[in-house]
Amino acid sequence: MKPIELCTLRGHLNDITCTEPYYIGGKVSLVSADSNGWIIWWDINTRRPNCVWKGHDSNIVTLRQICNGLLLTHSKDSDIKIWDVENFKSGSREMPAEKYNNVQYFSIDRDGEEDNNVSKNELLEAFPLPENVVIPVNALNYCNVDYSNHHLITPATTDSNNFDLYSIFKPSHQTDESLEAKLNLKRVAANIDPWKLYKKTITQLNKEQGVEFEIGNENDILKRDKFGIMMKVLFVRDDLFYIGYESGHLIGYHIDFSGAINNENEGAKSDSVKPDKNVSGLAGLFGNKTKSFDKTIINKDPHIKMIYMNDSCSPYPIISLVYDNKENKIICGSAGKQLTFHKIPEEFSQFNDISDCKRYNLRHSGIQSVSINNSLLVVGFWDGLIKGYDLDLNELFKYCKRLPRIDVLESNSGQQQPREKQNSIKLCTVKLVIPNETDVVKSNDYKSLIKHKRDITTTNLLISSYYDGTITIFKV
């Protein structure tokens, strides 16, 4: 099996940092972001943008479709933004131009001068912005953020080793409200220290077993400062998330929201609201009236407990996490050569400190990105190499995007002929894309049949992005 290259998308002038398949009404498209804050929403079939805008002034670290057409971005400019992309009808379809590339639109110039003789108003006129809301966040490291069911996990405001949990939306039946009016930012858990949580968990387990021993900082066996900074965070479900750390530890956390709920009434109310997955845009996120029990929420943080720990990747930092929903496992990649598989516990009443797990030596270091579907596992490495495996980890293919270059002559004598050398391009992400459902062709005219035949989104696709600003799409 070898992937078939279908096309290459070119438009970014900077290193691509994130890509995200974007689903609307059962149709798949692609969103990409780069190191200068530019965002492009691509039509995969036409190979052209649906919309282009400058979303941030710095490197975009997280790009995530959270639900119903809303797009979340997180950047090193200390902002998280949520964009209503689907309902944006007046966006630019022009590629970013060099004169606009480095304009700092969202920051205030200290000297009051405009960058590259281009005004911010000119940039906004050329590339209008979708409706959006802004959430300030810690940008001291390169850890991503993740979202599930109105809740957001981010590195803590004051310490990148710790994390915060936010509630960012309050359900409302007023669908005509703006996105900004619906934002209800609330930090429900602040500066959660994993090391203190670990000490508390182990101490409690020791007491239950009759062992009088408490972990102290002076006996810390870790080579780094405790677990180090957060590297990757991943929600598995609404009340369960995993964080990969600089030390190589993978830790699972369970959120118990029941402690923050009190006074449940048996009478159902018809004016309560929950997201409707069948309705797109803001109306789907906030506009579905359903019956539910009236609950009074008291001002109490949810209970977060540590339920899993594994150090199989230590001492290498964890740089990639993905969830395999078919096997209910977390797949973890690090700066080393080993890919590890972690079974998610079936119940969370007991802490699982597991020293062993399934691991595979891929014989190549720097596991930058991992993606999986029902039959294929794809791993991308720092240096641009992509490997494909079946679910039993038998290697199926290798691919490396090469950039031809001419070797430098050793002398000016003219005796040595220049030789062409192959130089690999640094990889950013690999993504396996769930194909569209094949539509029945309602018309038998030639144009409709050709359009249906050329629709590549009905097949299994592999999308790889690179630091030269290109995106390559394969059929797998």
From Swiss-Prot:
The keyword Zinc-finger does not apply. WD repeats lie at residues 11-52, 55-93, 132-176, 313-352, 362-399, 441-476. Keywords: Chromatin regulator, Nucleus, Repeat, WD repeat. SMART domains: WD40. GO terms for cellular component: nucleus. It is found in: Nucleus. InterPro entries: WD40/YVTN_repeat-like_dom_sf, WD40_repeat_dom_sf, WD40_rpt. GO terms for biological process: chromatin organization. Its main location: nucleus. Component of the ASTRA chromatin remodeling machinery complex. Belongs to the WD repeat ASA1 family. Component of the ASTRA complex involved in chromatin remodeling. This is ASTRA-associated protein 1. The lineage of its organism: Eukaryota, Fungi, Dikarya, Ascomycota, Saccharomycotina.
